[in-house]
Amino acid sequence: MKYTEIMVRYGELSTKGKNRKTFIMQLAQNVKRALADFPALKIHADRDRMHILLNGEDSEEVIPKLSKVFGIQNFSPSIRIEKEMPAIRAMVQEVVREVYTPGKTFKITAKRSDHSFELDSNGLNQELGGAVIEAIPEIQVQMKKPDINLRIEIRKDAAYLSYETIRGAGGLPVGTSGRGMLMLSGGIDSPVAGYLAMKRGVEVEAVHFASPPYTSEQALQKAKDLAEKLVPYVGTIQFIEVPFTEIQEEIKRVVPQGYLMTITRRLMLRLTDAIREMRKGLVIINGESLAQVASQTLQSMVAINEVTSTPIIRPVVSMDKTEIIEIAEKIDTFELAIQPFEDCCTIFAPPQPKTRPRLDKAQEYEARLDLEGLMARALEGLKITEISAETAKDKQEDEFADFL
């Protein structure tokens, strides 16, 4: 089937009142960026929906990219038809013959935005329903949940026919909720947290702590690859590598073993908050899931969070591990996340970390550190890399060249 346009429905944007125009403009920008590989496309966004004119581009290639753009409830590939009843009838019959298999039911859903057209919506439903039965006499009408829902829209310029409704990514357009710093480890949970934050409109920058030689180059690349998996949903991600070796060595030297993880996490949070301020972010996002590990009990969260007043978003905090894994598999981060490379949270992990650390003890042990100097040197050594679809493509080409 040769489609001529894709009709996009906004979903939650329809509830945004006075801010609606801003949300729609951001969505249009995000769609344009996601479909940048298709230069012939034209995008028209109005109050109720968006129309993507294909202009000869292949809908089969466009649809997978469009399905990852947050802010879209669903969309329908459509066929443009001359606004004359004989032409509309003929196309309806052609489409239903192509998609019908024995036992399927159908329904006609007509909408007439051009009120000068010869038939109203009810008239179109009746006329085109008759055309379907004429083409396939044995087909049955089903008004609720039909197998085939033929949608006809009569606009000023032409008539448009669609029969397929594809579920979108939902949520809000990325960029409408401000910027957040994602504490991206190499595990399963943090990429899922980033994905869920982006779904609510947050522009995410990834903060990753590296402690060479204790953590390897492969572990760092794994974190970058995880960030790359999130790129199709957002366009580009700034990957911020934080040198953490000196800090971890000093923590190990002066802090009792049971509090190593608590103090390590406090320093990570302090640094992430400092980076957030530098990068003009509003929130911190992490992959903490309540009581999953020692540093994620409520008592640990209290002892760690004390270092900042910045809001911390924990999208997976109440999820079971199986629920998190299900999303990780959906966004294709799971197999990558389970690769066995050490990260900063595991290299000096004590055999018996405190699950109920006391805040006063955490403050006492942290005071043994030269916080100002350690943080200043770490912040001076930040490495920021932009990860985009283009950089991912270049990496694939380099890997292929190495293989040859």
Curated annotation (Swiss-Prot):
Residues 60-165 form the THUMP domain. It catalyses: [ThiI sulfur-carrier protein]-S-sulfanyl-L-cysteine + a uridine in tRNA + 2 reduced [2Fe-2S]-[ferredoxin] + ATP + H(+) = [ThiI sulfur-carrier protein]-L-cysteine + a 4-thiouridine in tRNA + 2 oxidized [2Fe-2S]-[ferredoxin] + AMP + diphosphate; [ThiS sulfur-carrier protein]-C-terminal Gly-Gly-AMP + S-sulfanyl-L-cysteinyl-[cysteine desulfurase] + AH2 = [ThiS sulfur-carrier protein]-C-terminal-Gly-aminoethanethioate + L-cysteinyl-[cysteine desulfurase] + A + AMP + 2 H(+). SMART domains: THUMP (SM00981). Pfam families: ThiI (PF02568), ThiI_fer (PF22025), THUMP (PF02926). Keywords: ATP-binding, Cytoplasm, Nucleotide-binding, RNA-binding, Thiamine biosynthesis, Transferase, tRNA-binding. Transmembrane segments: none annotated. Pathway: Cofactor biosynthesis; thiamine diphosphate biosynthesis. GO terms for molecular function: ATP binding; CCA tRNA nucleotidyltransferase activity; tRNA binding; tRNA-uracil-4 sulfurtransferase activity. It is found in: Cytoplasm. Coiled coil: none annotated. GO terms for cellular component: cytosol. Its EC number is 2.8.1.4. Its main location: cytoplasm. One of its GO terms (biological process) is thiamine diphosphate biosynthetic process. ATP binds at residues 183-184, 208-209, 265, 287, 296. Catalyzes the ATP-dependent transfer of a sulfur to tRNA to produce 4-thiouridine in position 8 of tRNAs, which functions as a near-UV photosensor. Also catalyzes the transfer of sulfur to the sulfur carrier protein ThiS, forming ThiS-thiocarboxylate. This is a step in the synthesis of thiazole, in the thiamine biosynthesis pathway. The sulfur is donated as persulfide by IscS. Belongs to the ThiI family. This is Probable tRNA sulfurtransferase. It comes from Enterococcus faecalis (strain ATCC 700802 / V583).
